[in-house]
C-alpha cells in the first residue's frame, strides 16, 4: 500500500480548504446580499479546474499520477463544496427566499455543467495543440 498518496491528498486537501475559506472571506467583504455568491463562484471554478486538469494536465504526463490525484481529489475536492450548497439552499428556503434558492441551485447545476464543459474544451484544445506541435505524450 502506498502511504505517500494519503499524505499528498491530505496536504492538498488542507490547501484547498484554506483556499476556499480565504476566498470566501474575500468575496464576502464586497458581497453583502442574500445570494451565496462565494460558494457559487468557488464551485464553478472547481468544476472548470477539475475538467481542465483531467483533460489536459493528467494526459501530458508531466506530473506523477499521485500529484494529479492530490490536486483533483485533495485540493479541488476540498475547495469545492456540495454540502455548503445544500445547506445554504435549505437556509434560503427556511427564510422563504424561494426565488433566490431556485436561482442558486439552477446557477450551480447549469453553471457547473457549463464550466466543466469549458474546462474540458480548453483542455482538449490545448492537448491537441500540444500534440500537433510535435510533442508526444
UniProtKB/Swiss-Prot annotation:
| Top-rank lineage group of the source organism | Bacteria
Q: Which NCBIfam families match?
A: crcB
The entry's function note states: Fluoride-specific ion channel. Important for reducing fluoride concentration in the cell, thus reducing its toxicity.
- Which residues participate in Na(+) binding? 77, 80
Give the UniProt family note.
Belongs to the fluoride channel Fluc/FEX (TC 1.A.43) family.
Sequence intervals crossing the membrane? 4-24, 37-57, 67-87, 98-118
One of the entry's Gene Ontology molecular-function terms is: metal ion binding
- Name of the featured protein: Fluoride-specific ion channel FluC 1
Catalyzed reaction equations: fluoride(in) = fluoride(out)
* Subcellular location field: Cell membrane
- Which GO terms of type biological process are on file? cellular detoxification of fluoride
Q: Which UniProt keywords apply?
A: Cell membrane, Ion channel, Ion transport, Membrane, Metal-binding, Sodium, Transmembrane, Transmembrane helix, Transport
Is-annotated flag, keyword Cell membrane?
A: yes
Task: Briefly describe activity regulation.
Answer: Na(+) is not transported, but it plays an essential structural role and its presence is essential for fluoride channel function.
Q: Name one GO cellular component term.
A: plasma membrane
InterPro entries to which the protein is assigned, alphabetical? FluC
Q: Does the keyword Endoplasmic reticulum apply?
A: no
According to its record, how does it sit in the membrane? Multi-pass membrane protein
Amino acid at each position: 500500500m502506498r502511504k505517500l498518496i494519503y499524505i499528498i491528498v491530505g496536504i492538498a486537501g488542507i490547501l484547498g480548504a484554506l483556499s476556499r475559506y480565504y476566498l470566501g472571506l474575500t468575496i464576502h467583504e464586497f458581497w453583502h446580499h442574500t445570494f451565496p455568491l462565494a460558494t457559487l463562484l468557488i464551485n464553478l471554478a472547481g468544476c472548470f479546474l477539475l475538467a481542465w486538469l483531467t483533460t489536459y494536465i493528467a494526459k501530458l504526463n508531466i506530473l506523477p499520477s499521485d500529484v494529479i490525484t492530490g490536486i483533483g481529489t485533495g485540493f479541488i475536492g476540498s475547495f469545492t463544496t456540495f454540502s455548503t450548497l445544500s445547506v445554504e439552499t435549505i437556509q434560503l428556503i427556511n427564510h422563504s427566499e424561494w426565488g433566490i434558492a431556485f436561482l442558486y441551485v439552477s446557477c450551480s447545476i447549469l453553471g457547473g455543467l457549463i464550466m466543466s464543459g469549458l474546462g474540458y474544451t480548453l483542455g482538449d484544445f490545448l492537448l491537441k495543440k500540444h500534440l500537433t506541435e510535435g510533442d508526444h505524450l
